[in-house]
């Protein structure tokens, strides 16, 4: 999905009902992706990881994640969940 829009998903499947936010569609290399993941984790005050070209943030923090990404000038869309 490389249409220039970053999508923020809420997912519970396979996580015992615990919600996580998944950020997909970022065109960043591994180092930049990890740095953005660290900033999002600080903004949300929670844990998370960056792997397979996605950022996973623990908990339902879609509003904060969308606001932070839009502040960085990215086109963001809430999707799923």
Please report, for each region that a protein language model flagged, where it lies by residue.
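Long, charged, low-complexity intrinsically disordered regions
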Residues: 1-42, 49-52, 63-81
């Amino acid at each position: 999905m490389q249409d220039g829009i970053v999508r923020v998903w809420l997912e519970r499947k396979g996580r015992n009902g615990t919600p996580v936010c998944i950020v997909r569609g970022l065109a960043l290399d591994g180092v930049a992706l990890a740095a953005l993941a660290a900033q999002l984790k600080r903004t949300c005050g929670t844990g998370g990881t960056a792997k397979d070209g996605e950022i996973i943030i623990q908990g339902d923090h879609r509003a904060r994640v969308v606001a932070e990404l839009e502040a960085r000038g990215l086109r963001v869309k809430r999707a799923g969940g």
